[in-house]
From Swiss-Prot:
<dbReference type="GO" id="GO:0001046">
    <property type="term" value="F:core promoter sequence-specific DNA binding"/>
</dbReference>
<comment type="subunit">
    <text>Forms a heterodimer with USP.</text>
</comment>
<feature type="region of interest" description="Disordered">
    <location>
        <begin position="819"/>
        <end position="841"/>
    </location>
</feature>
<dbReference type="GO" id="GO:0046982">
    <property type="term" value="F:protein heterodimerization activity"/>
</dbReference>
<feature type="compositionally biased region" description="Low complexity">
    <location>
        <begin position="292"/>
        <end position="326"/>
    </location>
</feature>
<keyword id="KW-0805">Transcription regulation</keyword>
<keyword id="KW-0862">Zinc</keyword>
<feature type="domain" description="NR LBD">
    <location>
        <begin position="840"/>
        <end position="1070"/>
    </location>
</feature>
<dbReference type="GO" id="GO:0045944">
    <property type="term" value="P:positive regulation of transcription by RNA polymerase II"/>
</dbReference>
<keyword id="KW-0675">Receptor</keyword>
<keyword id="KW-0539">Nucleus</keyword>
<feature type="region of interest" description="Disordered">
    <location>
        <begin position="437"/>
        <end position="458"/>
    </location>
</feature>
<dbReference type="GO" id="GO:0005737">
    <property type="term" value="C:cytoplasm"/>
</dbReference>
<dbReference type="GO" id="GO:0000978">
    <property type="term" value="F:RNA polymerase II cis-regulatory region sequence-specific DNA binding"/>
</dbReference>
<feature type="compositionally biased region" description="Low complexity">
    <location>
        <begin position="59"/>
        <end position="82"/>
    </location>
</feature>
<feature type="compositionally biased region" description="Low complexity">
    <location>
        <begin position="619"/>
        <end position="636"/>
    </location>
</feature>
<feature type="region of interest" description="Disordered">
    <location>
        <begin position="492"/>
        <end position="514"/>
    </location>
</feature>
Length: 1073
């Protein structure tokens, strides 16, 4: 069962009486005590983790001799003035005290008795009903003694104890005794008026009991002050003394560092104080020598204890080195607090008469404090005692708050077993015996070393497990076949070098790493408010990682305080309900307290009630709260930093519903493929660039400084704006569309880059390059408006090349053959003149088209001179017919000579073919140029005549020609097919040919070209039986040719005009007989 300990602050105030004069006797006492502490070299210096004492052999013989002379002088002065009332102290004395009793206080501070006899004795009997030895008697020979705080009953009378509540005001009155041989028995229990449970007062610290007894039995105020090293006291007459005890009920669940320090220094303080008191009272040299020997033994024991402390500190040195950056930040805050404390101490103490009491400083402050604060000191001499008491309480309150800040970093020791609890109780009960206290401390240190060894063993095992690194850089999850959160989302982690209280608290279970790199969350672009502390050097345990990811989805984060981590907690704080809530100089731990990160190793002293008069701590706390509120921190809930908040279930549900709604709105396409949330980089196609996916965080394995910045990951639950766009619809339908800037400008195929000034595909680039380098000439067999696309770009080279020029491809950019393979350089030597290789043969259909085009009259050069002539005789009309027929046959002769392979035939066969086909070609070409809705007739020489002008000469043959023209135009024949048809009319099987095989081969070539044209031409494919219908026109031409011969024979019979030789030869050649 644990003992409750209370931090007590006793304020003793002396109220002034009627007599305000200071006698010579009083001045002598003040001088005596001042000289004692002016020359004394015994002082105490308290640092952060060790207590150093200097000159433990004091007081010296010189001090004792001086004290003896001063006592004699005081006795003589008192005999000269026997009627003077006994002096009493009037200065406000502020003595901090630790009360370790649960229900009250049983302490006598400076209980003195007053007597006019120089040989009077003052007995201070501190009795106790506890099982521990409770009686301690000290005899002091002095001139003046203050009366007890309460009237002392006779020695034979049983002592009565009046119970009072703990923490209440206890006021006693002083009494004067003029008897020179009177004995003042000062009872500590009756003076403090504690509750009935003060029977356990003997279990108090040895330093407290020794100081109380020594002060109570001191022969005079100066001797008592010398025993306890009390500051200078000013004495007045007929005054009363009051004590104010502030005792907040704060339960301590573990052994505080104060108890460790008290058990270590109890024997030293007790023996030193007792020896000093006995030496000044009896002036015995032998006792002084024994006191000196005891001090040497105590020094040896203290050195042993310091060595043990150094060993214990050496074990924790690694952990302290890892917290360098927080300690540097703590050093600045401690420097500021020390400066503020010095200012407040200067208000409480007088610079000329400031002296510290080693006894009460040891009792009140832990061994690892930096400066001696709140020592029993005497302030100045105020005019109004009430104002002085108020100001002292205010300054003491501020110093208590500051001291709590500095001492809150002291880790509380946890009682993990019943054996440790018994050991702690034993150390408390036997603190009066230095040997027992030292033995208890050694046992406690041995248990701590065993516990540290076990923890180190566990840390090594965990370190071996954490050394398994996953391929993506994160630690493998222990005991699970599935990847951990770090392995799956390692892209959201980076390293850090800061120290955090959570990691500091878990340092006992997690293995320390030498690289100070741990995985922490970091989003993209860094938008978190600055953190006051990062992660510690040790990697997080798997349980902590699970807690981390679980708590990220909560609005407020609460970190569980596990039993194995509470001992290393660097900063503990808890919520205050309102008003000041003092915890003395100890960091009280509440069972329901949560770990709260702080900006330094020591936790902040938090409270709600800040008075308007508290200009120092109130402003500081308000500034800290404002700085926390700026970064969205909650100072009372322990939330000093923020982790990225992952999307909650509601947000994920909203986002999923929005995506499903967008997919349902798209008609005619499959549902979109859901992207997996994997840490990989994806390349988005240009068409799908509008559908932005969430930006992935980048992995950075670098150390983070203490003031790290992070950003909260927020989920955009709005529906995708590109879900209803045409590009996304095409993506869902499986069609991948590309932007127009990435397509070929000529044929529409995919284009990688620009060629010759225009973005074109590789096919069009090569076609344009070959055409320019070879100087090829193409002929369009249609109307020079052929479609050029990816599928039909190879059908008409003429139109494809023209489109290349139209879109802006530059011919001058193409390298010639002489510069081929020499980019930007001219040939060093000109090549020898060589004949250029023959150009590849032009396609047959292209040659036929060219022959037709070359022998067709230009529409701009037509001859309208004979159009609609009115005055013409019939002979002129017949003569005009012969001229038109002769000129047309000459043009047809030119067309025949341009047909490829025509000159390969025998001249006889050439003449036969021409004479047989000349009249057919005349009709075919005339019918092709004629229009049904037009009355004009255009002949091969370019002459234009009206249809009525040809009736006399053509007769009924003209009507048949116009009918053939109608049927020819109904076929919608193009120029390429018409050129092939003209060639087939000439190159055909005739009677009397000498080499009909060659004529047949040439005919088959022309037919093959016509078939290819009809097959691959888009317009020709739309016509049914187009090829057979074209070939069916050849027999019709022969019939029309026969009709023409008949008309010529008729005109020859009329003999109006003689027929030309060409006509006669043609007539004779074509006759069947």
């Amino acid at each position: 069962m644990m003992r409750d300990r209370l931090a007590s602050l006793i304020v003793v105030k002396q109220e002034g009486g009627s007599n305000t004069s200071i006698s010579h006797h009083q001045a002598t006492a003040i001088k005596c005590e001042a000289s004692l502490y002016t020359e004394s070299s015994l002082f105490q210096e308290i640092n952060n983790n060790s207590c150093y004492r200097q000159n433990l052999n004091a007081p010296t013989h010189q001090q004792s001799h001086t004290s003896h002379l001063q006592h004699a002088q005081q006795h003589q002065t008192h005999q000269q003035h026997p009627l003077l009332p006994p002096p009493l102290p009037t200065l406000p004395l502020i003595y901090p005290c630790r009360n370790l009793f649960p229900d009250g206080c049983d302490i006598n501070h400076l209980a003195c008795c007053s007597s006019s006899n120089s040989n009077s004795n003052c007995n201070s009997d501190s009795n106790s009903t506890s099982s521990s030895p409770g009686n301690s008697h000290f005899f002091a020979n002095g001139n003046t003694c203050a009366a007890a705080l309460t009237p002392a009953p006779p020695a034979t009378e049983p002592r009565k104890i009046k119970p009072l509540g703990a923490g209440k005001l206890k006021v006693g009155k002083t009494d004067s005794n003029s008897d020179s041989n009177s004995n003042c028995d000062s009872r500590a229990a009756a003076a403090a008026s504690t509750s009935a449970t003060s029977a356990t007062s003997a279990t108090t610290l040895a330093a407290t009991a020794a100081a109380t007894a020594a002060a109570a039995e001191a022969g005079g105020a100066a001797s008592a002050a010398a025993a306890a090293k009390i500051s200078q006291v000013r004495l007045t007459n007929q005054a009363t003394t009051s004590m104010l005890l502030l005792q907040p009920n704060s339960s301590f669940s573990s052994l505080s560092p104060f108890d460790n320090f008290s058990t270590q220094t109890a024997s030293t303080t007790t023996t030193t104080s007792a020896s000093a008191a006995g030496h000044h009272q009896h002036h015995n040299h032998l006792l002084h020598q024994q006191h000196h020997n005891q001090q040497q033994q105590q020094q040896q024991q203290q050195q042993q204890q310091q060595q043990q402390q150094q060993q214990q500190e050496h074990l924790q040195q690694q952990h302290q080195q890892q917290l360098v950056s927080p300690q540097q930040h703590l050093l600045k805050s401690e420097t500021l607090l020390s400066h503020e404390e010095d200012q407040l101490i200067s208000n409480l103490t007088d610079s000329s008469v400031v002296s510290h009491s080693e006894l009460f400083s040891d009792l009140f402050f832990p061994s690892d404090s930096n400066n001696s604060l709140l020592s029993p000191t005497t302030s100045g001499y105020p005019d109004n005692p009430a104002e002085d008491l108020t100001s002292s309480i205010e300054n003491l309150t501020k110093l208590t708050c500051l001291r709590d800040k500095r001492l809150s970093s002291i880790p509380e020791q946890q009682l993990s077993s019943e054996q440790e609890q018994q050991l702690c109780l034993l150390s408390l009960r036997s603190s009066s015996d230095p040997a027992i206290a030292l033995h208890a401390q050694q046992q406690q240190q041995q248990q701590q070393q065993q516990q540290q060894q076990q923890q180190q063993h566990q840390q090594q095992q965990q370190h071996l497990q954490l050394q398994l690194i996953s391929p993506i850089g994160g630690p493998l999850s222990c005991g699970s076949s599935l990847p951990s959160f770090q392995e799956t989302y390692s892209l959201k982690y980076n390293s850090s070098s800061g120290s955090s209280p959570q990691q500091a608290s878990s340092s006992s279970t997690a293995a320390p790493t030498p690289t100070d790199q741990v995985l922490t969350l970091k989003m993209d672009e860094d938008c978190f408010p600055p953190l006051s502390g990062g992660w510690s050097a040790s990697p997080p345990a798997p349980s902590q990682l699970q807690q981390l990811h679980t708590l990220q989805s909560q609005a407020q984060m609460s970190h569980p305080n596990s039993s194995n981590n509470s001992s290393n907690n660097a900063g503990n704080s808890h919520n205050n309900s309102g008003g000041y809530n003092y915890h003395g100089h100890f960091n009280a731990i509440n069972a329901s307290a949560n770990l709260s990160p702080s900006s330094s190793a020591s936790s902040l002293y938090e409270y709600n009630g800040v008075s308007a008069a508290d200009n120092f701590y109130g402003q500081q706390q308000q500034q800290q709260q404002q700085s926390y509120q700026q970064h969205n921190y909650n100072s009372h809930n322990g939330e000093r930093y923020s982790l990225p908040t992952f999307p909650t279930i509601s947000e994920l549900a909203a986002a999923t519903a929005a995506v499903e709604a967008a997919a349902a709105a798209t008609v005619g396409g499959p549902p979109p493929v859901r992207r997996a949330s994997l840490p990989v980089q994806r390349t988005v196609s240009p068409a799908g660039s509008t559908a932005q996916s969430p930006k992935l965080a980048k992995i950075t394995l670098n150390q983070r400084h203490s003031h790290a910045h992070a950003h909260a990951l927020q989920l955009n639950s709005a529906p995708n704006s590109a879900a209803s766009s045409p590009a996304s619809a095409d993506l869902q339908a499986g069609r991948l569309l590309q932007a127009p800037s990435q397509l070929c400008a000529v044929c529409g195929d995919t284009a990688a880059c620009q060629h010759y000034g225009v973005r074109t595909c590789e096919g069009c680039k090569g076609f344009f390059k070959r055409t320019v380098q070879k100087g090829s000439k193409y002929v369009c067999l249609a109307d020079k408006n052929c479609p050029v696309d990816k599928r039909r770009r190879n059908r008409c080279q003429f139109c494809r090349f023209q489109k290349c020029l139209v879109v802006g491809m530059v011919k001058e950019v193409v390298r010639t053959d002489s510069l081929k393979g020499r980019r930007g350089r001219l040939p060093s030597k000109p090549k020898s003149p060589q004949e250029s290789p023959p150009s590849p043969p032009i396609s047959l259909i292209t040659a036929l088209v060219r022959s037709h085009v070359d022998t067709t009259p230009d529409p701009s050069c037509l001859d309208y001179s004979h159009y609609e002539e009115q005055s013409m005789s019939e002979a002129d009309k017949v003569q005009q017919f012969y001229q038109l027929l002769t000129s047309s046959v000459d043009v047809i002769k030119q067309f025949a000579e341009k047909i490829p392979g025509y000159f390969d035939l025998l001249p006889e066969d050439q003449e036969l073919l021409f004479q047989s086909a000349s009249l057919e070609l005349f009709v075919l070409r005339l019918a092709y140029r004629a229009r049904i809705d037009d009355t004009k007739l255009i002949f091969c020489n370019g002459t234009v005549l009206h249809r009525t002008q040809c009736l006399r000469s053509f007769g009924e043959w003209l009507n048949d020609i116009m009918e053939f023209s109608r049927s020819l135009h109904n076929l919608e024949i193009d120029i390429s097919a018409f050129a092939c048809l003209c060639a087939l009319t000439l190159i055909t099987e005739r009677h009397g040919l000498r080499e009909p095989k060659k004529v047949e081969q040439l005919q088959m070539k022309i037919i093959g070209s016509l078939r290819d044209h009809v097959t691959y031409n888009a317009e020709a494919q739309k016509k049914q039986h187009y090829f057979s219908r074209l070939l069916g026109k050849l027999p019709e031409l022969r019939s029309l040719s026969v009709q023409g011969l008949q008309r010529i024979f008729y005109l020859k019979l009329e003999d109006l005009v003689p027929a030309p030789a060409l006509i006669e030869n043609m007539f004779v050649t074509t006759l069947p007989f």
